[in-house]
Amino acid sequence: MKERVTITLDKNLISQIDKRIDGIDIKNRSQEIELLLAESLGTNIPSKAVLLVGGRGTRLKPLTDRIPKALLEVQGKTITEHLFDLLKKYGIRDIILCVGYLREKIKEYFGDGSRFGVNITYAEEDEPLGTAGSLKLAKKHLKGSFIVSNGDELKNVNIPRMFRLHKRKDALATIALTTVDDPSHYGVARLDGSRIVEFVEKPIKAPSNLINAGFYILEPEVIDMISDGFSMLEKDIFPKLAKMGRLRGFPFAGQWFDIGNIERYKIAEKKWEGIIPIEEDEVDLE
């Protein structure tokens, strides 16, 4: 909900504000002033995050026969707790866990989150719904900008910087992007500046080596685009947003590990450094 206000500013301030208006990403004074106020008041990060932890982890068998991959440990701490660490680093403590496979074990382990310094709400799927379908279950809890993260990856992303890009570019969705030598196993983005002009899931011929790092900032309108039943953000939603010109990419240089199979899981166990700031290495495409 927005309210109209009237303010009086010094001419020099107005001149500085007008210089930031490009008619494309920043369309008027009101939008630029709102962004500047949000940044100065510290409301420069989403307040809620959704972690998608309902998958069966079939490529991690036999480890996931009795243990959900959300509870697999890397260096003595569950994968999910490492994600909590990233979110808590930036003051994000309201977390929704989208659960499915072996959900009772996840709920028993994490409870309401107080033991881990977070507040947990659960969105439960009775059958596999995909990354978009499970997100839709959390709709009633998501009124403003929010974060979504896959639950089977470790990542170190500068969330405030990513959110600033997201808001300044008036995006409906912003995807954190990392690079790999072989992008054919992932969602791949082609950028024009920060705008994702093409997004292809697991392409035979990749348009770049920038891949989806499984970490997003979304607006509630994205949930309204999700159809009932099984649906994937990567295949059903992101390509549409790219065509609309409302999908942005945030390349980052922090650590990222996909823990989707046994081999990658072992690599993460050896090389993950924890949530360490690498801000000076991150790319800021404003």
Regions found by a protein language model. Give the residues of each.
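Conserved N-terminal catalytic core of the sugar/cofactor nucleotidyltransferase
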Residues: K2-R4, K11-I26, Q31, L35-L51, ...
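A short, conserved acidic/glycine-rich loop-to-beta-strand motif
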Residues: K169-T179
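Active-site metal-binding loops of divalent metal-dependent hydrolases
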Residues: R56, D152-E153
